[in-house]
Amino acid sequence: MTRSLKKNPFIAKHLLRKIAMLNTTWEKEIIVTWSRTSTIIPTMIGHTIAVHNGKEHFPIYITDRMVGHKLGEFSSTLNFRGHAKNDNRSRR
């Protein structure tokens, strides 16, 4: 279900504060965050944000095509290793 248009997009306050500070000083550094639910807004374009995937922080460079999506969409949490090659033991 999508978010109501009456509400503003959710962005973590600490993340918004860090991006605003970097935009005023024109610095580019990696921002580390655990907030996968934050929505990408136009002020984030050009920054690299390291999003936590449950094990490590995965760096993501924000482009204009990502605006409106969530940060968690770009760092997958599951690692599919494939099905078993020889499944004879489970058939017994």
From Swiss-Prot:
The keyword Plastid applies. Its main location: plastid. GO terms for molecular function: rRNA binding; structural constituent of ribosome. It is found in: Plastid, Chloroplast. GO terms for cellular component: chloroplast; mitochondrial small ribosomal subunit. The keyword Glycoprotein does not apply. Pfam families: Ribosomal_S19 (PF00203). One of its GO terms (biological process) is ribosomal small subunit assembly. Keywords: Chloroplast, Plastid, Ribonucleoprotein, Ribosomal protein, RNA-binding, rRNA-binding. PANTHER family: RIBOSOMAL PROTEIN S19P FAMILY MEMBER, SMALL RIBOSOMAL SUBUNIT PROTEIN US19M. Protein S19 forms a complex with S13 that binds strongly to the 16S ribosomal RNA. Belongs to the universal ribosomal protein uS19 family. This is Small ribosomal subunit protein uS19c. The gene is rps19.
